[in-house]
Every structure is written in structure tokens, then in C-alpha cells.
């Protein structure tokens, strides 16, 4: 199939040349890592693995490590909400999602600007959310989280986290409770010990991608998509890292090409502007192989832009079905 006849040969061929590209492989079931990992390592590649099949064996991935400005915080929050919304789900009332994202923005901005590095992670976001108790029968009650933001406001009334928190806090106690429940439903996976351990620190060193030969494998279950949101965040941050590195550090083009092998492409929620990135990445020495079952999957993903996505692909490889 697609993996055996295209993805694996790409990896094997790279091992024959000392100038082979770096790889980012979406790897359902871990087949690519199992069959090519040792060969890549022996050929001089550094191997990193985000293993959502066996999280206790995975390298850790903390998205907070790669935040460099307030815009990237906003992108992280937006992408998390998009990736944790079930495909095809139509919210009856978008108010709850938009206000829940305002609360999440307040919490992430607080950690990004105020917390020590070891506390900047999603498990700490969950701790803060749990500290924000709301009493529906008492609008005047101040939770430990309210006190935290009050102190920050006294110190810096114009703080971006304070602005977002006040926006969230403007509703009644009953409304605030519903907002918290909405946010908790998007963040529920971060209650699991396995994901807490995986996202507490970072061992992926995404900043090295494009600087030296690396192979990053994202192992995902092919029958359960509930953790795929983490790969969506990884994609968004990787594209951001690679584009910034090419533009601001290397005069527009990465010294080591980076090839994304996106097997089961349809299973991952992509960054909002993926089709725009696709048209501009080649000049930066970043390449993508979109691997799908059929064109119908592409049409479902990019209802209006699917022809543009197809047009931005140099080659179309069709395997007989």
C-alpha cells in the first residue's frame, strides 16, 4: 500500500546520502519507525518519537516551550480548540466555545508571562482551572484563581492575561460555571496521568529541525483519534518554527531540507492556513507528501480549496486500487 510503496522508500533512500533531508513522519501504528528507525539512526539521524500509542515510551512534548510571543499563544489556543472539536460538529451556540477560549487564553497568558519555566505547561493550566471554583448561589465569592488575577491586576492593570480574565469574569456565576465546563470538555485528556507526564516537559527540540538531520515520528492509533489534537499542535508549531528559522536565521531557506510524510493525512486537524503554507514552503526548503486513500478525503478536508491544495503539489502518485 501507500506506506510500503512510497513512505518507506523515501526514508530508505535518505539513508544512502549524507545530505538526506530531515523527516517529520505521521506514523499510524508505528510501522515506519519499526521498519526504518534503526537504519536512520545508523545513518546519522537523530530520532525523536511522539508516541501516542505507548505514552510512557514517548519523548515528552510541551508546546509552551516553543511560544515566543503573544500571537503564538493565541494561535496555540485557537488550534487546540479547533483540534479538540469533533469533525462535523456544529455548536448550537458558539458563545460557549468563544468564551471558553477567552478563559484558556487568560490562563495560558498568565503562565507564559508570570510562571517559572517548569510551571509553563498544560497540566498547570488544568490546576488553575480547578482552582477557579464558582459558587452559583454566591456571585461575590472569590476563588483562589480570582485572587491570583486580582493580585496581578493590582501589579499591572494592563496585563494581557488580566484583560482576558476580566472579559471572561463579566458573566454571572451560572454563566461562568458553564464556560468552565465547556473548557474542561476540550481539555479533558489533560486529566490523564499519561498525558500529564508527556506534556510536563519537552524533549523534542523542534528548534533543531532544519539545522541537522533529524527524524521525528508521530505515532498515532489508527482506530482512536482522541489524542490526535496533540499532533495538530505539533504541526502548527513545527511550521512556525521552520518558517521563522528560514526567514530570520538562514536568509530564507533552511540548511537541511525538511520533508513531512503525512500518512493518514485526513486524520489530523491541520493549521487554519495550511493551504497558504503549502504554496510558500518550498522556497524555504520545506516539503510535504500528502498521503490519502482517495481524492474524496481531500474534498472533505478542503471543501473550497481542495483544487488549490492539489495544484500546489508538484507530483501526483496514484497507486492502483
Give residue spans per PLM region:
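Conserved ATP-driven motor cores of ASCE-family P-loop NTPases powering translocation/secretion/packaging/pilus
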Residues: 278-321
Amino acid at each position: 500500500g501507500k506506506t510500503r510503496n512510497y513512505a518507506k522508500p523515501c526514508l530508505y533512500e535518505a539513508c544512502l546520502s549524507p545530505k538526506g533531508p530531515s523527516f517529520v513522519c505521521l506514523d499510524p501504528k508505528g510501522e515506519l519507525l519499526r521498519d526504518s528507525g534503526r537504519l536512520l539512526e545508523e545513518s546519522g539521524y537523530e530520532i525523536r518519537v511522539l508516541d501516542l500509542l505507548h505514552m510512557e515510551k514517548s519523548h515528552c512534548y510541551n508546546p509552551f516551550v516553543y511560544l515566543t510571543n503573544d500571537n503564538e499563544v493565541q494561535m496555540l489556543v485557537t488550534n487546540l480548540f479547533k483540534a479538540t472539536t469533533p469533525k462535523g460538529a456544529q455548536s448550537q451556540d458558539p458563545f460557549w466555545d468563544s468564551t471558553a477560549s477567552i478563559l484558556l487564553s487568560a490562563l495560558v497568558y498568565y503562565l507564559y508571562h508570570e510562571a517559572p519555566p517548569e510551571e509553563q505547561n498544560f497540566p498547570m493550566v488544568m490546576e488553575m482551572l480547578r482552582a477557579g471554583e464558582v459558587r452559583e448561589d454566591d456571585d461575590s465569592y472569590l476563588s483562589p484563581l480570582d485572587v491570583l488575577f486580582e493580585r496581578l491586576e493590582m501589579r499591572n492593570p494592563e496585563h494581557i492575561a488580566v484583560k482576558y480574565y476580566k472579559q471572561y469574569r463579566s458573566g454571572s456565576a451560572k454563566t461562568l460555571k458553564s464556560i468552565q465546563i465547556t473548557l474542561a470538555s476540550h481539555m479533558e485528556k489533560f486529566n490523564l496521568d499519561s498525558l500529564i507526564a508527556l506534556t510536563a516537559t519537552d524533549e523534542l527540540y523542534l528548534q533543531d529541525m532544519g539545522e541537522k538531520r533529524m527524524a521525528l515520528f508521530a505515532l498515532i492509533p489508527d482506530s482512536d483519534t482522541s489524542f490526535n489534537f496533540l499532533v495538530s499542535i505539533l504541526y502548527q508549531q513545527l511550521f512556525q518554527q521552520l518558517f521563522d528559522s528560514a526567514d530570520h536565521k538562514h536568509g530564507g531557506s533552511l540548511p537541511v531540507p525538511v520533508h513531512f510524510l503525512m500518512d493518514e493525512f485526513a486524520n489530523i486537524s491541520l493549521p487554519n492556513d495550511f493551504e497558504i503554507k503549502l504554496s510558500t514552503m518550498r522556497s524555504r526548503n520545506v516539503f510535504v507528501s500528502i498521503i490519502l486513500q482517495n481524492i474524496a478525503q481531500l474534498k472533505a478536508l478542503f471543501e473550497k480549496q481542495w483544487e488549490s491544495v492539489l495544484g500546489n503539489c508538484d507530483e501526483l502518485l496514484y497507486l492502483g486500487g
